[in-house]
Curated annotation (Swiss-Prot):
GO terms for cellular component: cytosol
Active site: 80
Protein name: tRNA pseudouridine synthase D
Residues that, per the record, bind substrate: 27, 129, 329
InterPro entries noted in UniProt: PsdUridine_synth_cat_dom_sf (IPR020103), PsdUridine_synth_TruD (IPR001656), PsdUridine_synth_TruD_CS (IPR020119), PsdUridine_synth_TruD_insert (IPR011760), TruD_catalytic (IPR042214), TruD_insert_sf (IPR043165), TruD_pseudoU_synthase (IPR050170)
Gene: truD
Keywords from the UniProt entry: Isomerase, tRNA processing
Organism ancestry: Bacteria, Pseudomonadati, Pseudomonadota, Gammaproteobacteria, Enterobacterales
GO molecular function, one term: tRNA pseudouridine(13) synthase activity
HAMAP family: TruD (MF_01082)
Similarity annotation: Belongs to the pseudouridine synthase TruD family.
Gene3D superfamilies: TruD, catalytic domain, TruD, insertion domain
Enzyme Commission number(s) from the entry: 5.4.99.27
SUPFAM superfamilies recorded: Pseudouridine synthase
């Protein structure tokens, strides 16, 4: 298995280094749910600004304030403790009376707005995230500038970031230990983290191998293609390749890579053979996903940051702004720009 730091770069390995997250204000994330609260229902959606608090900590504090069980507070995604983040939490509080959230006091946390909603907010149920990042101590401004232009046009690999695998790869190591054992994992969080790390590592490996090919973005017979911004896909046939290639070049369609598991992978013929060969040696992780009945799925191979802009504060400091769809990683954009000083596996998704 190729280490995250050695996965293929789309624009070549960066020439310079830089620092990500010198302080929390250098990493700002604003959740975009893609919908507005219903204004009625037994749940309450709260938009919360936090600094120095991780998501689970805030959710537990909110549950305690509302005198409800922790499982009655949900969120769409984990956000990092060492960042400034705006995200939505959801609490199940039946009844007409609205709690007085001005009395909710937690250091580093502020309730910005709240409203009733009919449905529970589930993990992954958001449109995307808007990022404002500051990269400091950049050693090669010219190289970063060139890469930003290239990313605007060509995107970046849609890798799962190092944080998916835990500090020091602990989640992936946990998955490997579990795969080689018949002992059940009763901790639901560990089970989820380990299975996610296993599938993500296999996806990264498939993308890594495809990006090694000079014609990586050429549609091949049996590729699974996805309409940009959609989750469903269809299979390319040899008769359609010229027209499908035109649509891929125009970013209307995206070539996908497998999120392996049980069931059909989605690709066929030449594309399926390539994906199977790319992870042929990773039998332990594949067996785990089959054993635990994790359903196979697809994910776009490339990621195009939307609304990408940047502003140089000086020759060694640049502020980046961009929007990414849910499930994509800002750190996978940053790794195409600089060799990051320090380990950012601690950054939450």
């Amino acid at each position: 298995m190729t280490e995250f730091d050695n996965l293929t770069w789309l624009h070549g390995k960066p020439q310079g280094s830089g620092l990500l997250k010198a302080n929390p204000e250098d990493f700002v994330v604003v959740e975009d749910l893609g919908f507005t609260p219903d204004g009625e229902g037994e749940h309450i959606l709260l938009r919360i600004l936090k600094n120095g608090c991780n998501t689970r900590f805030v959710a537990d504090a909110l549950a305690k304030f509302l005198k409800i069980h922790a499982r009655e507070v949900s969120f769409a995604g984990q956000k990092d403790k060492h960042a400034v983040t705006e995200q939505w939490l959801c609490a199940r509080v039946p009844g007409k009376e609205m709690p007085d959230f001005s009395a909710f006091q937690l250091e580093g946390c502020k309730v910005l707005e709240y409203a009733r909603h009919k449905r529970k907010l589930r993990l992954g149920a958001l449109k995307g995230n808007a990022f404002t990042l500051v990269l400091r101590e950049i050693s090669d401004r010219r190289d970063v500038e060139t890469r930003l232009q290239a990313i605007r046009d060509g995107g970046v690999p849609n890798y799962f970031g190092a944080q998916r695998f835990g500090i020091g790869g602990s989640n992936l190591q946990g998955a490997l230990r579990w795969a080689q054992s018949n002992a059940p994992v009763r901790d639901r969080n560990k089970r989820s983290f380990w299975l996610s790390a296993a599938r993500s590592a296999l996806f990264n490996q498939i993308v890594h191998q495809r990006l090694k090919k000079p014609d990586f973005n050429q549609v091949v017979d049996g590729d699974a293609l996805q309409l940009a911004g959609r989750g469903s896909w269809f299979v390319a046939t040899s008769e359609e390749l010229p027209e499908l290639q035109r649509r891929v070049d125009e970013k209307e369609l995206m070539i996908t890579a497998s999120l392996p598991g049980s069931g059909e992978w989605g690709t066929q013929r030449a594309a399926l053979a390539f994906e199977q060969d790319a992870i042929a040696q990773e039998t332990v992780l594949q067996s785990l996903l089959l054993r635990e009945k994790v359903e196979a799925s697809r994910r776009a191979m490339l990621l195009y940051p939307q609304q990408l802009s940047w502003n140089w504060w000086d020759d060694v400091t640049v502020e980046l702004r961009f929007w990414l769809p849910a499930g994509s990683f800002a750190t996978s954009v940053v790794r195409e720009l600089i060799n990051t000083m320090g380990d950012y596996a601690h950054i939450a998704e």
